[in-house]
């Protein structure tokens, strides 16, 4: 018998109810016997003490059968004899005390039997020790920024891990104080990739003069003990205030599995530090490195210089997928989303699984789903969760050895990555709970099944399809108030303790065995230090870079092959919309009606053939949305996600959001089908400008010409509301004249004619000539396009920036001069009209006053119109506002500080 005291609890999964087992909790830790939970959404439940010994015996029986299947019963004859003796002992036990004594022995025997399994016979276990990241906002993306990192010992090795784990530092002080996250062990078990944040790196000399977004630093007991000179506590921190750690960031490093060498791979000499579009609006940070079978590696990075739209000006740049050759050479962008795409992992077929946050005209919280791509960035496809709200964040995906199953963590949008574990079978379905098997039903799926529930798993590693190594904490990883800025002290007090997470062995039999719990700091990312089979290396299907066009080719076999039934023969064309990413930290109101709306630019339409097929080109390297458009020029069906193409890529699908389990998997080919004509998008109307659609430039002139004489200027019958200027949009929405997708009030998935022009009373009115207005075909199509793009308002000439021309104020002196000239030319009545009835703030040439004056006076009045508007405060510089000390975009400090300048890099000092 094993006499050592162990900490363990079991869950009886067969009946779907978790129950507590005996526990001897270490001093200062929670008593796990008081923590039990019902499966799924039921959450916590009281322990049933009367049947715990019988449950322990049933678990031991299942464990014996499982291990005996692998080893043979002869190898376990001694354990079988002990199990039968314990069964007899339990039957004879009469008192609760006696039954508890037997239960303890049964659980010890069960642990010993389990550890006999051949897949658990490795000698060493790799892990990471670090503090738990935190920020002023409890959000899933903040944790990956170095500024919020908490230091720790880093990479450690646990020897004798089954019985009495002995911890040792892998790198033995080769790296300075800092934080290691998300290591990846090569299949040959000879080297390790990991992300590291160097806490000894210094900010630029003039950093305190820069307008740097605020950072809050909490007291850290581990740092205080081992590094009292750390900036958290030193005079430098007090002098520098909260900005002292804002420069910290993660880069990628590689080391030998035996710790004999370590090197920096990114953020060091040789890294060109190139960013998308040359923007300099976010510090480059690299995380989530993952080896590829072709010799390179994939990782997530802020090199795309994007931001999510719902962070309210916080410094939270998006991470997108990149790849590099061995040693960090030839870095290339793989994904082009507008929000985060992260946590890449190689599946058994050689493709890369990753998590995508996707809220294109849909809820910003519930859709962090699982996607896959080939290692060259082609053939992007949905794996699970794009239509489902059952699991909010599907992440930390790992392929099960020798299986089609994937091990995933169901995590929360408003928390660090942790939650409940489940197995996913993509062959069963791509949404809902049918393809999901819960591994830890005692922990609810965070947010979708409950908020602030106790217990959380994270960074799991599958030993096989039954056994999983995984950190676990019984603490509540949440905060009392939904928005912590209002009750920050309470929020901070509720944050997990430094040693919240320890390593456990979790199994689908119903058992939970503690492997290692450090009393001072949390332990994450357990990985057996053994070789594993390498997945196949997928050869790139792309043309050589010097021969690749700047476009990709897409084809659709049949737009009518759809989850929702589309009206027969209704689709005339596909509209190709380019999604405009938010390239800076700070932005003003995006739209009056929806502050989280995404800006879009219609590139034009491509025809759909009679058989429902279409083949067309799209620009490479940008996110694209598709809309199926009918013969009236209005959207029938709208994609609420996006596609993108690599240069020279050929990609295809069966239909519009087709069910691949009904129609077969989405097609992928190196060449397009023969005999089809390939079209380039043709603009529906000539907007007269490039970039995202602008209400002020395109729709206001239509209202000015046909509507405001009644709706705003008081001519004829007094109207119920005004359409003068952008207030007209608000008035139309208030009176439910236009149908749009409002953030946090969206339907879960697209349906035919559900929103936009076709569902808007305004569209029906202008079509039938409301009020005698006779709009041209081009004007009608412009209105339809505006509504189909979700009633976009402010975009062009700065996009999400505060620096857009549509937001320019009137210049008092210039307005006075303009009105004087109007009074002389057109009379007092016109001169007294609202400023927005005379001047178009976004495009002066389309100002209404220019239509009213004589042709020979237009040039003079155009000069007066331009003088009546204040100039934009500044011109953008590499994506920033360029105002430096008077910065309004919260990003100028990146450029001024030279954070992405390869000549100013500070490589980590490796000993």
Residue ranges and their predicted role:
Residues 355, 395-504:
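Loop/turn-rich, solvent-exposed surfaces of beta-rich toroidal or solenoidal domains
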Residues 163-178, 257-283, 325-339, 374-393, ...:
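Multi-bladed beta-propeller domains
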Residues 120-121, 187-188, 292-294, 347-349, ...:
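Residue-level detector of Asp-centered blade-edge/turn motifs that repeat once per structural unit
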Residues 21-44, 48-51, 62, 83-108, ...:
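Aromatic- and Gly/Pro-enriched helix-to-coil junctions and flexible linker segments
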Residues 123, 127-150, 195-251, 275-277, ...:
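Short, conserved, GDST-rich strand-edge loop motifs in beta-rich repeat architectures
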Residues 126, 184, 290, 335, ...:
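Conserved beta-strand position repeated across blades of beta-propeller domains
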Residues 154-156, 251-253, 320-322, 369-371, ...:
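A short loop-to-beta-strand structural motif that recurs across blades of beta-propeller domains
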Residues 121, 151, 179-181, 188, ...:
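Beta-rich catalytic cores
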